[in-house]
Curated annotation (Swiss-Prot):
Record-level GO cellular component terms: plasma membrane
GO molecular function: transmembrane transporter activity
UniProt-recorded name of the protein: Uncharacterized transporter YdhK
Topology of this chain in the membrane: Multi-pass membrane protein
Organism lineage: Bacteria, Pseudomonadati, Pseudomonadota, Gammaproteobacteria, Enterobacterales
Disulfide cysteine pairs (residue numbers): none
């Protein structure tokens, strides 16, 4: 039977692009080299080297370097912890179990407090300790502790070195190119986002678009970290890239602020929409300049000095144009490789983030309880394969405690383990028993891994499954030195691994992570607490830090299915962020008129009275809004131009707070979920 040409073209090998072939060959060769080197170094379980090479198979240089550093640090820390715990408690099974469960629970708690490399290092330290320590319960000689620990660390390092070497031989696309492309795409998308938000209607598409823009900007921080590790140029420009991220977040805030003003402006100019479209079209041009932009927005300049609404919109629109043009210029200089000294940009710290400490503690407790239950069962039943169940349970609890959908991830892992159990049985007892040399086995592995890598790239919906099959295949085939073919041990070990994941799934079902509604309430409470701090004389965060912290809170529920929780978290974030910008502008606003300064202080005190960590209280929101409106109308008739500017700023505060009038009535939400208790 002959294969037709269309059928051949549909195979993964013929469908693959050159980039996909490069990725598949690089990772496959790295895994085969890692297995070969570990085997000839006489490491007793060389398949861990192959697994390590698979784990660090990132598509970019910076990703490989950053993940490798985190993996080495985590492996060394985990091996040290395993040696200390096992060395002192191995003769006392219960003390050993509680100590290991406590350490892995601590690592689960700690990884929730960090991001990127640090979080990955704590994850590795947790389940590396499990991989090393739990199999030690079956050893007789205490001197074997060091041999096992150094063998596991050596296998990890061999896999990392092979992955790094293949990345140098078959490099992928530049991290810097990917970062700059993402910056430019986001810069252009902000104009599209402005055109969408500056429309009078309110739809779910607008909310989703706003969440999407926030999430994409925060995701670029990961690209910045990868670029930092890939090239010295981006290490020198790291502070500038941080500043660009903050500027894009500020542009998002200004777009939202202008939207609030347009929605609360009773009589905007008739030509405002036409002028805005012309402005956005001009800003989209690569050579846009300040003079042309000024000519376009000139028709929107307020003619009536007492029209504080028009003045507020005009000032904020000018600020948006200035900030966008400045960002365009700075992005062009960074892309063209200009020296750092020539790029005039304010250096800012990295993006701020918040840790849900209650959820982190709960995850640590869940890990401790899961391992304790499995360990108690193993000790009581004298289950020889108990270490395998403990190891897989530790990996599951540590890895999936910080994912958004742990049940989906654990179900996928269960599916992976069942498929690998069947496949490894055929490979081990049908093929490997007939192989006498390693090179013969590599001839089988090489095309297999290449095909799986290509399928992972060509089937995005099943990429997670193919990735787990590649990573866990080594531990199921278990290429040991020397090889061992014992069907009873094979069956018991695979059963133990599946049981360990199943009990982890059960633990997540019993000790469930907080619901999205609960998480939303905690994030909103933290937002209000940080905003109250912003009203103090010496706030803990400056304007940019509070802005990035707020957007980090909002992004935490971007994948939530609870639309109400997600909507109110976004609404509170936008309201408090717009209010904080007004507060910082009021602080910077100065006038020689003492009465005007007192008016400014009154507005800040109104915010202190109306906002607390528990919500809007002490003064009804409607009364506060009426007071702000009265102040604006009074200042509009003042003879000093500074009073008109102050009225414009206060009206922006009124527009921001008015969004909280849409809070649901008490009793329509779950207990404790009321956003504005006295609205």
């Amino acid at each position: 039977m002959k294969l037709s040409l269309p059928a051949l073209r549909n195979t993964p090998w013929f469908k693959a692009t050159s980039g996909q072939w490069r990725y598949a060959l690089r990772n496959t060769i790295a895994m085969c080299l890692a297995l070969t080197f570990a085997y000839y170094l006489n490491l007793d379980e060389p398949y861990w080297a192959m697994t390590s090479a698979a784990v660090v198979s990132f598509p970019t240089v910076g990703g490989v370097i950053s993940k490798s550093l985190g993996r080495i640090a985590g492996s060394l820390l985990g091996a040290t912890a395993a040696l200390i715990i096992a060395g002192h408690t191995l003769n006392e099974p219960w003390l050993f179990l509680f100590s290991m469960a406590a350490w892995i629970g601590f690592c689960t708690w700690a990884c929730a407090h960090f991001t990127n490399n640090a979080a990955y290092a704590f994850q590795l330290s947790g389940y590396t300790a499990a991989i090393i320590a739990f199999p030690m319960v079956n050893i007789v000689e205490i001197t074997q502790l060091w041999d096992i620990a150094q063998a596991r660390v050596c296998e990890v390092i061999v896999g990392i070195l092979c992955g790094g070497m293949m990345m140098m031989i078959l490099p992928s696309t530049s991290d810097g190119t990917a970062l700059l492309t993402a910056f430019k795409n986001m810069h252009a998308r902000l104009l599209e986002h402005a055109s969408l938000l500056w429309q009078p209607e309110t739809t779910d598409a607008i909310r989703s678009a706003h969440e999407g823009v926030i999430g994409q900007i925060l995701t670029m921080n990961l690209l910045r970290i990868q670029a930092f590790w890939s090239h010295y140029r981006f290490r020198r420009q790291n502070a500038l890239l941080n500043a660009l991220l903050h500027q894009q977040l500020r542009l998002t805030s200004v777009i939202s602020s202008l939207r609030r003003m347009l929605l609360n402006w009773p009589t905007p100019p008739e030509n405002s929409r036409e002028v805005i479209e012309q402005l956005l079209a001009e800003l989209a041009k690569p050579r846009a300049d300040s003079y042309t932009v000024a000519q376009i927005i000139a028709p929107l300049r307020p003619q009536d000095e007492q029209d504080y609404r028009h003045l507020a919109f005009w000032q904020r629109l000018r600020y948006f144009c200035q900030l966008y043009l400045r960002s365009s210029r700075q992005l062009y200089l960074i892309e063209s490789g200009a020296p750092v000294d020539q790029i005039h940009i304010r250096r800012t710290p990295g993006l701020a983030r918040h840790t849900d400490n209650a959820e982190a503690i709960w995850s640590g407790v869940r890990t401790f309880c899961t391992l304790t239950v499995i360990g108690a069962w193993s000790i009581g039943a004298q289950w020889e394969s108990g270490p395998g169940a403990l190891t897989l349970a530790a990996i599951s609890c540590v890895l999936y405690s910080i994912v958004a959908t742990p049940f989906k991830s654990l179900s996928l892992l269960m599916r992976t383990l069942v498929l690998l159990s069947l496949f490894s049985f055929v490979v081990k007892f049908g093929l490997m028993v007939q192989i006498t040399d390693l090179w013969q086995f590599l001839l089988f592995l090489f095309p297999l891994f290449v095909t799986m890598q290509l399928l992972k790239l060509q089937m995005p919906k099943l990429a997670g499954l193919w990735g787990q099959l590649i990573v866990f295949m080594g531990s199921f085939i278990a290429v040991t030195n020397p090889p061992v073919y014992d069907f009873a041990d094979f069956l018991n070990d695979n059963t133990a691994k599946i049981v360990g994941v199943a009990i982890s799934w059960l633990a997540f079902a019993i000790l469930r992570p907080g619901s999205d509604a609960v998480k939303s309430r905690r994030h909103i409470r933290a937002l209000r607490r940080d905003f109250v701090d912003q009203l103090s004389r010496h706030p803990s965060h400056n304007e940019s830090e509070f802005e990035s912290l707020t957007y980090h809170h909002v992004s935490q529920l971007s994948n939530s299915q609870d639309a109400l929780a997600r909507r109110w978290l976004l609404r509170w974030g936008v309201v408090l962020l717009n209010c904080s910008h007004v507060v910082w502008q009021l602080r910077a606003w100065e006038s020689r008129s003492d009465p005007l300064s007192r008016v400014r202080d009154i507005c800040i005190s109104l915010l202190r009275d109306v906002m607390s960590e528990r919500g809007v209280q002490q003064r009804p929101l409607a009364v506060t809004l009426q007071e702000l409106q009265r102040i604006c109308d009074t200042l509009a008739h003042h003879h000093q131009p500074a009073a008109h500017e102050l009225a414009a700023i206060i009206w922006r505060l009124h527009c921001s707070l008015s969004q909280l009038e849409q809070a649901p009535a008490q009793g329509t939400l779950a207990p404790g979920y009321l956003m504005t208790p006295q609205a």
